[in-house]
C-alpha cells in the first residue's frame, strides 16, 4: 500500500513583531485582557510590500531542504490561503514559477483556518492514487491586510506567517486518515463581508476587514473539535493514549486546552505557538509542526493529531505517523 509521508517541514515568520504592549497604544485594550482571553502575547506582522507568496517561498525552500530533494522533484503544489497575492493567478502558480518548477498541477485552497488540513488531505489523495510522488503543501497568510486595526476584538488575534511540508509516496506508514467538514449556515459568525463579486468598492477602498462574533465562534469550535477527535480515533480504532502529540490550529489557548482535555492529554504533549504567533490562520498548523520537528519534540514513528476549525464554518483533522 502507498502512503503519503511527511518527508520535510519548513516555516517562515516575518521579522516584524507586534506585542500586546504595542497594541495598547493603538486600541483600547491591555496586555492582561488579551493574555487572559486568548493566551496571545505577540504576533509577527508582514512588512509593507511583503506578500503571502514571499512568506510561502521561504517556508517552501526550508521544507524542500529538510526533505533532501530538489524543487524540481515536486510534482504537485497545493497552497492554502485566504489572503492571496492576486485575484488570479493562484499563489500556487506564482510560487511554482519562483521555485523553478514547470508543468505540475498547482492550485490554491481556501478554507480559512482549516486550510492547511484541507490542503494536506487533498495532496494525500493525489499520492494515494498515484497521481503524485512528491507534493508541496503550504499554508500561508498575511492576515494583517484584512484586519481593522481600530477593532480591538479582532486586531489583537491574528498574525502573519507561512508553513510547508513535503509529502512523498512511501511504503512506510504516513498519513493514517483525514477528516474534512463544513457547515455554511454559520457564514456570518466569522467572515469578511465583501469580495470581488460583492461590494468590490469596499475592497478597493481598503475596507475588507474580518468580522467575528467571538463568543459564538468559541462555543461552536469547542463542541465541533471534540466531535472530530472522536471521529478520528474511531476511524483508526485507536485509544486516546496512543496519540503522542496534538498539533492544533492556534486560534485561542482556551480552545486548545479544551481539545487537550477531550484527549486526556497533558499540555506538555500539545504543541502551542499561539502565545508567540497569534492566529496565523492556514499557516498555524504547519508553523507549529515545523517548530516541534526541528526542536526534536516530534520524533519519527510518533503518532500526531492535527486538527483545525475556521470560518465557513470549516473543520478537519489529520492523523499521521510522523
Curated annotation (Swiss-Prot):
Region (ACP-binding): 250-254
UniProt subcellular location: Cytoplasm
EC number: 2.3.1.180
Similarity field: Belongs to the thiolase-like superfamily. FabH family.
Domain remark in the UniProt entry: The last Arg residue of the ACP-binding site is essential for the weak association between ACP/AcpP and FabH.
Keywords noted in UniProt: Acyltransferase, Cytoplasm, Fatty acid biosynthesis, Fatty acid metabolism, Lipid biosynthesis, Lipid metabolism, Multifunctional enzyme, Transferase
Name of the protein this chain belongs to: Beta-ketoacyl-[acyl-carrier-protein] synthase III
Quaternary data: Homodimer.
Organism encoding this protein: Marinobacter nauticus (strain ATCC 700491 / DSM 11845 / VT8) (Marinobacter aquaeolei)
Amino acid at each position: 500500500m502507498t502512503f503519503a509521508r511527511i518527508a520535510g517541514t519548513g516555516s517562515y515568520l516575518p521579522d516584524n513583531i507586534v506585542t500586546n504592549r504595542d497594541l495598547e497604544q493603538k486600541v483600547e485594550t491591555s496586555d492582561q485582557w488579551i493574555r487572559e482571553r486568548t493566551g496571545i502575547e505577540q504576533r509577527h506582522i508582514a512588512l509593507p510590500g511583503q506578500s503571502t507568496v514571499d512568506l510561502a517561498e521561504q517556508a517552501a525552500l526550508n521544507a524542500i531542504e529538510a526533505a533532501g530533494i530538489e524543487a524540481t522533484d515536486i510534482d504537485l503544489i497545493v497552497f492554502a490561503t485566504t489572503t492571496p497575492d492576486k485575484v488570479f493567478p493562484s499563489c500556487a502558480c506564482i510560487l511554482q514559477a519562483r521555485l523553478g518548477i514547470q508543468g505540475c498541477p498547482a492550485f490554491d485552497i481556501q478554507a480559512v483556518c482549516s486550510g492547511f488540513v484541507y490542503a494536506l488531505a487533498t495532496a494525500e489523495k493525489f499520492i494515494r492514487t498515484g497521481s503524485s510522488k512528491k507534493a508541496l503543501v503550504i499554508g500561508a497568510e498575511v492576515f494583517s491586510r484584512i484586519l481593522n486595526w481600530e477593532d480591538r476584538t479582532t486586531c489583537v488575534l491574528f498574525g502573519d506567517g507561512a508553513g510547508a511540508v513535503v509529502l512523498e509516496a512511501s511504503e512506510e506508514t504516513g498519513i493514517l486518515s483525514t477528516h474534512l467538514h463544513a457547515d455554511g449556515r454559520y457564514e456570518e459568525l466569522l467572515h469578511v463581508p465583501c469580495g470581488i463579486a460583492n461590494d468590490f468598492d469596499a475592497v478597493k477602498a481598503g475596507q475588507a476587514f474580518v468580522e467575528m462574533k467571538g463568543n459564538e465562534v468559541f462555543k461552536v469550535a469547542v463542541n465541533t473539535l471534540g466531535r472530530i477527535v472522536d471521529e478520528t480515533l474511531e476511524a483508526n480504532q485507536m485509544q486516546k493514549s496512543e496519540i503522542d502529540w496534538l498539533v492544533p490550529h492556534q486560534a485561542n489557548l482556551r480552545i486548545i486546552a479544551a481539545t487537550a482535555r477531550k484527549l486526556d492529554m497533558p499540555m506538555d504533549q500539545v504543541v502551542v505557538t499561539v502565545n508567540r504567533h497569534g492566529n496565523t490562520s492556514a499557516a498555524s498548523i504547519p508553523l507549529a509542526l515545523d517548530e516541534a520537528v526541528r526542536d526534536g519534540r516530534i520524533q519519527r514513528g510518533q503518532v500526531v493529531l492535527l486538527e483545525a476549525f475556521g470560518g465557513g464554518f470549516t473543520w478537519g483533522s489529520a492523523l499521521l505517523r510522523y
